[in-house]
Amino acid sequence: MTISRQFTGLTLAGLFLGLSLSAQAFSPSVQTGADIRRTGFGVPHIRAENERGLGFGIGYAYAQDNLCLLANEIVTVNGERSRYFGPEQLTVEERENRISDVFFQWLNTPQAVNAFWQAQPAEVRDLVEGYAAGYNRYLAERRQQGLPQQCQGEWVRDIAAEDLVKLTRRLLVEGGVGQFAEALASATPPQAMANIENNARAYQLADTRLQRFALDRGSNAVAVGSERSFNGRGMLLANPHFPWVGGMRFYQMHLTIPGKLDVMGAALPGLPMINIGFNQHLAWTHTVDSSKHFTLYRLQLDPKDPTRYLLDGQSLPLSKQTVTVQVKQTDGQVVPVSRDVYSSQFGPIVQWPGKLDWNNQFAYSLRDANLDNDRVLKQWYAMNRAGNLKDLQDSVHTIQGIPWVNTLAVDDKGQTLYMNLSVVPNVSTDKLARCSDPRAGLKMIVLDGSNSACAWDIDPHAAQKGIYASSQLPQLLRKDFVQHSNDSAWLANPAQPLTGFSPLISQDGQPLGLRSRFALDRLATLSKKGLVSVQDLQHMVMDDQVFLATQVVPDLLKFCTSQSEAALKSVCSSLKAWDGRANLESGVGLVHFQSIMQAMQESPQAWRVAFDPKDAQHTPRGLAIEKPEVAKALREAMLASAEIAAKMGLTEKTRWGDVQVVSSGGQQTPIHGGPGTLGIYNAIQSVPREDGKLEVVSGTSYLQVVTFDDKGPHAQGLLAFSLSSDPASKYSRDQTEAFSKKQWSVLPFTEQQIKADPQYQVQTVRDDLEKTGKVAAQ
């Protein structure tokens, strides 16, 4: 399938918008294809002679396992959900269809998609076009058999390369304007404020989702070097925390082009390359960073017209883009509904009642640095092919395509690398002091939109206008260790703090998250005992220690000794019996601990030892139970927890595995782990169900521990939610059950390992109209 500019001779738009929708516009005489070799848990090892064939194999294999998931995401990123499912149904991300459609119609215009495509190198185009063709081949075959029950509508269709570009652009803005879809789609000039009131439900959902964003997209990573590893080689733990459903659900695979590419790991839907993984000489992972990837601009509006703004004293009109969404009515008819999206020269207007109001005096524009990032696919493919750590580092320095994550890596020589080299707006500390609204603080950067001097600075050495050059961003190369769990770059290794950066890049002197404190504490303990082993890294995740419990449980139990109320005694008894972990067999004390500490952590006065930037690894800690106000708050939190447990139907005999589960195909699997906010490294987010249980929605996803010897990599891993999202697939629960039992799997990488796997089978798929692949037992 190709995307190309078309001359129609009739309209200027044709020059820019002509996108071929044919998914197989290639010479029929050229036959490409791939071998899809599956091993344990169905993991595909895809081998082809070139990128087109490799992409074909990836798309085919992915469709075998996740046909309906990708079909659904394609509808979403094309802004067509209201057309097929009605305007008020919620997406997987709990966003109303009508809001989602307006946002994606605005984001993925033909001009934007075509510009992205034109920037791609030939190898990336071949991968993407091959992926679309492979997906379509399997879809055609599956139609003959009958489509899965969950995707038997007209919305399931062949895809094209531009659909995959739209998926990629959605990924890019996850850390920016993607969090403000409601605010963008509903922004209305002051005369029409009634429309805002009608969107109260949408904003409530958006507010909840925004608060949960960091929890759903976190990660842990530890890279151990030659000075600390058991064999003097590099060793990497990758533990990304991502959604278990939808368009951010990882897929496990191994990609090979003989003599050019050999890489294994996991990728997000629609991406024909590995995001997190390893090859012959190195392993890498990502953690969601704390850097800013967008800024807001507060516009000073023209007193005569709220659709005009003042810039350097000159009145300028807001541009207006009319977005038309096809909407299915209750009678089944589909009618067009139009919506205007307003923008200043800084970006789209976003309106959030009570937070970002558009009135007669001010409005807010959002500028997302990743909207101009067309380098992300090129970046990951270069990382996939890196022959050593320097190659990987150089590619990230040069391409600057990493959108909103840190990179941690190791090599077979024993080096470790940390890079906070993502796409960050170039706003210096001095400019921030001159241009930002101090009332907004540093959580959300708000710059002065009436002064052109407050625009992002331009560094000629950066890969993109308005972002920091890679040489100005934090990075660390060491031989002992680097680690990260979604804090700033500051203490990736406490022996060499990274300081002095713009607050948009990294803030030092701030409290560490509890997962970071756990990791630093565990690594210090391991260092005292000796060298770090593979099992040590596995245990960091799988022993499910609740780090916060080590800091406060003694105070909780001391408080309990003075309590006599029956409800409090029950809570205290559970806390005393609890093992301080989030294992399946851990007691109901974990539920009480979570409820109590969620309430207590909201008060800085609750800590007995306050945060000290000179001792960030060990503070804050302890509960100041001797303070009357803290004792009162603690008592109230315990009573509230007793009520919650009663409503959930929990007793002192309840175990954590009875409470937290994941459902698939009518079956439930108990899941260990818990909230990362409690310092549980194996971070799992779950939401209440009507039956009193908690349903897992995100958290530990793809797990890998990789080390090396003279022959290459040795890896163990798991995909916690399993390979397939189809409940009918035999690969939909198998790895989930293994994860529940804490059973790691050896990841076969060499040809000998792959073919020796007891579950080995191979399917050859050809990219032509005549032949289809057949499964052959080997």
From Swiss-Prot:
Q: Which UniProt keywords apply?
A: Hydrolase, Periplasm, Quorum sensing, Signal, Zymogen
Q: Which GO terms describe its molecular function?
A: hydrolase activity, acting on carbon-nitrogen (but not peptide) bonds, in linear amides
**CDD domains attached to this UniProt entry:** Ntn_CA
* Chemical reaction(s) catalysed: an N-acyl-L-homoserine lactone + H2O = L-homoserine lactone + a carboxylate
Q: Extract the InterPro entries matched here.
A: Ntn_hydrolases_N (IPR029055), Pen/GL7ACA/AHL_acylase (IPR014395), Penicillin_amidase_A-knob (IPR043147), Penicillin_amidase_dom1 (IPR023343), Penicillin_amidase_N_B-knob (IPR043146), S45 (IPR002692)
Predominant subcellular localization, coarse grouping: periplasm
Tell me the leader sequence span. 1-25
> What is one GO cellular-component annotation here?
periplasmic space
Its annotated compartments are: Periplasm
EC code(s) of this entry: 3.5.1.97
Q: What does this protein do?
A: Catalyzes the deacylation of acyl-homoserine lactone (AHL or acyl-HSL), releasing homoserine lactone (HSL) and the corresponding fatty acid. Possesses a specificity for the degradation of long-chain acyl-HSLs (side chains of 11 to 14 carbons in length).
Any miscellaneous information on file? AHL-mediated signaling mediates quorum sensing in many species of Proteobacteria, regulating hundreds of genes, including many that code for extracellular virulence factors.
> What does the record note on quaternary structure?
Heterodimer of an alpha subunit and a beta subunit processed from the same precursor.
For this entry, the protein name equals Acyl-homoserine lactone acylase PvdQ
* Native organism: Pseudomonas fluorescens (strain Pf0-1)
